Amino acid sequence: MQEVEVRIITNSNDIPPMEGSNVFHSRQLFCMYEQTPRIKPIMIVATNRGGTMVGHVLATLRYRWTWLPPFLYTHCRIYGEGCYDTQISDKDKEEVFGKMLATLTRAMSYRALYVEWSNLSNKLFGYRHFRTNGYFPVHWMSIHNSLHSMAPQERLSSKRIN
């Protein structure tokens, strides 16, 4: 992979033209987040020597308030692994991702309480880079209930019906 420069963009006017159809990493979503209270969008852009964009990731810095105990904190959230140039190989894509991940981690180390990545298409994508940057996996429990196997009246007990 050629030398890649990674930069962080916080203003929609500074975003270069992008390719890709992933709505979670689009310029339009960035502009919507700019207008949303308590959310600050951050675009991580990787370009090669020629200035061509080889990858980008949209992150959101969210300001949260909790009542007990009362405090304000921020966290960074990213959906998916980002968008990449179609001409780069999977190995190069993972290297570009590693550079963008390291840049984002350094930038968020003093600004956010935690950084959360979710909805990765391949659970092993970038695993080595996540581990070297101090991330760890959290297994969430998913519950899927099927309401189509029985009629609603059959699901209720006799106490609930009367």
What name fits each language-model region?
Residues 1-162:
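N-acyltransferase acceptor-side catalytic subdomain
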